[in-house]
Regions:
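Metalloprotease/metallohydrolase-associated module, dominated by Zn2+-dependent proteases
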Residues: 183-235
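Residue-level detector of secondary-structure boundary/capping sites
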Residues: 16-20, 93, 206, 225
Length: 235
């Protein structure tokens, strides 16, 4: 079980999402990681054999760093919520060796990206790296499926995968990959929901692009699985 703390960094009250929306996001995250998501039946037959229950669960922490009871939801008003990046982590953070910190913001701007194009981000774990690279930063409208949430919550599922060590399946195109033999090679990020896509033919047997994979960029309603090899990396 991964103890979670959610830091809501809001500029205006419209960004200050409810506890209920936060809890809904964690419920959806657990459904995806335990393969209890309602859309498992959408996994194409060619991939059903490698679709995994990751046996990882996320839980809002019961105790804060001082040992006091907590909802594990904090609220901080700050203009840094707009065009946020690692700067919001300096506002509030709980020890990253005990908690997964999730910062919920209005919008995200990373160097090299246009304002508003990034839905969320996280870094793969790297021993010795600074806490600047810890945790997940995510837009409030990608958090949960109620309230201001506008999707099925898969941005959080995807970013938690990075936090637990996963790469994109399209990393390095057809010939490098994500160190998971059961994710077919894919040339570039998948967008939309193209079940006919097969951008790499160097795999044997030649399988279509796994647009169902949470670590690609297909639409939320296309994503529905992690694989056995991805599970092994995360655990």
């Amino acid at each position: 079980t991964v103890p979670v703390v959610v830091h809501i960094i809001y500029d205006t009250q419209s960004d200050n999402i409810s506890d209920k929306q936060v809890r809904d996001a964690i419920i959806g995250l657990n459904e995806d990681y335990r393969r209890l998501n309602a859309d498992t039946s959408n996994t194409r037959s060619i991939f059903q054999g490698v679709a995994a229950d990751c046996e990882i669960e996320f839980q809002l922490a019961k105790l804060d760093p001082q040992g006091n009871c907590t909802t594990a939801i904090t609220r901080t008003q700050s203009a840094l919520s707009v065009g946020a990046n690692n700067n919001v982590k300096g506002l509030i953070s709980w020890p990253n060796n005990k908690y997964l910190n999730i910062w919920v913001v209005n919008s995200i701007t990373l160097s090299g990206s246009g304002t508003g194009t990034v839905l969320g981000y996280a870094y793969k774990p790297n021993p010795g790296q600074s806490t600047t690279y810890d945790g997940i930063v995510i837009r409030h409208d990608r958090m949960g499926r109620i309230g201001t949430g506008t999707s099925m919550g898969r941005t959080l599922t995807h970013e938690a995968g990075h936090y637990l060590g996963l790469d994109h399946p399209f990393k390095g195109g057809c010939f490098a990959g994500d160190n998971c033999a059961d994710t077919p090679p894919v040339l570039e990020a998948s967008y939309g929901c193209n079940t006919n896509a097969n951008t790499c033919s160097n795999d044997s047997p030649n399988k279509p692009d796994m647009i169902e994979n949470y670590m690609d960029y297909a639409d939320d309603n296309c994503m529905n699985l992690f694989t056995d090899d991805q599970r092994a990396i995360m655990r």
